[in-house]
């Protein structure tokens, strides 16, 4: 069990705000952390890793990582950290990057096998693709068998095909080792696929906490589905009006009435929902 109760004043793009997080994470849980940019997600991960100071307490099992009397340095926290930028040693091979963390050839071989990197063990990082580098980074983070694995948008720089592959490998590693994991992500499909729980941060505080289905699937009453998107344009096609809306990485077209169109402004956030298979915009 990990118990987090921390406070820290932040100076973000929207002005000063207080990061105030009080949450418990069960052992073996894979938790997704989401929310707008500047809401405190990365700062929370850095505090957990001991890379930034904060007030409050962090208790992992029976050990305090942070309280009034102590703040354990990063190397004593048994943390695995996966960044967006890989952070590999360029002068070491794939295998050497792993063994540098811990001289455990058996564990290294197992991690490379799970992530399908065995044939690349002697390769240097400069010869690898972005997806391969991130898989090496993930394996290296697991070499010390961390009590807590932190991943800060680890798949954000990858294309959709490689993202899907790494999602499956993250799940395979999690199923194999059962490591408690906190992953920052903005992708609903990624969160739904990987996480057992999702927390939404807004201006430094938790505004939603639950299963991915409960938090991300915005349904209401008899609605079949509801998605938030950005209105890009309203165009006239023959005798009907069509709204062009960006939802995630896709564009959708929704027929709107004249009265609906009068109340819509290009650039605004809208909800696209359906009742009895008839999409509506709100």
Indicate where each model-derived feature is located.
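Conserved ABC ATPase "signature" region
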Residues: 63-67, 105-122, 126, 171-172
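A short, proline-enriched helix->beta-strand linker immediately N-terminal to the Walker B motif
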Residues: 143-147
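ABC ATPase NBD coupling module
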Residues: 65-81
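Conserved ABC ATPase signature
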Residues: 124-128, 132-134
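Catalytic Walker B motif of ABC-type/P-loop ATPase nucleotide-binding domains
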Residues: 149-153
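ABC ATPase "signature
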Residues: 209-210
């Amino acid at each position: 069990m990990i118990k987090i109760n921390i406070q820290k004043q932040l100076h973000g793009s929207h002005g000063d705000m207080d990061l105030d997080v009080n949450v418990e994470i069960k052992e073996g849980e894979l938790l997704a952390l989401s929310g707008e940019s500047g809401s405190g997600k990365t700062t929370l991960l850095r505090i957990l890793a001991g890379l930034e100071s904060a007030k409050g307490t962090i208790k992992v099992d029976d050990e305090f990582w942070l309280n009034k009397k102590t703040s354990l340095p990063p190397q004593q926290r048994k943390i695995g950290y996966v960044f967006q930028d890989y952070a590999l040693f360029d002068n070491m091979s794939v295998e050497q990057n792993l063994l540098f963390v811990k001289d455990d050839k058996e564990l290294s071989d197992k991690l490379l096998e799970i992530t399908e990197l065995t044939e690349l063990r002697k390769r240097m990082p400069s010869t690898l693709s972005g997806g391969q580098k991130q898989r090496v980074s993930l394996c290296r983070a697991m070499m010390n068998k961390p009590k807590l694995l932190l991943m800060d948008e680890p798949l954000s720089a990858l294309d959709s095909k490689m993202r899907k592959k790494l999602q499956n490998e993250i799940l395979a590693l999690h199923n194999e080792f059962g490591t408690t994991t906190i992953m920052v992500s903005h992708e609903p499909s990624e969160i739904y696929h990987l996480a057992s729980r999702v927390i939404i941060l807004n201006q430094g505080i938790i505004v939603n906490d639950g299963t991915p289905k409960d938090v991300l699937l915005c349904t209401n009453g008899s609605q079949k589905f509801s998605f938030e998107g950005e209105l890009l344009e309203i165009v006239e096609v023959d005798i009907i009006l069509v709204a062009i809306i960006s939802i995630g990485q896709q564009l959708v077209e929704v027929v709107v009435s004249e009265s609906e169109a009068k109340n819509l402004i290009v650039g605004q956030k809208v909800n696209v929902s359906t009742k009895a298979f008839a999409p509506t915009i709100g």
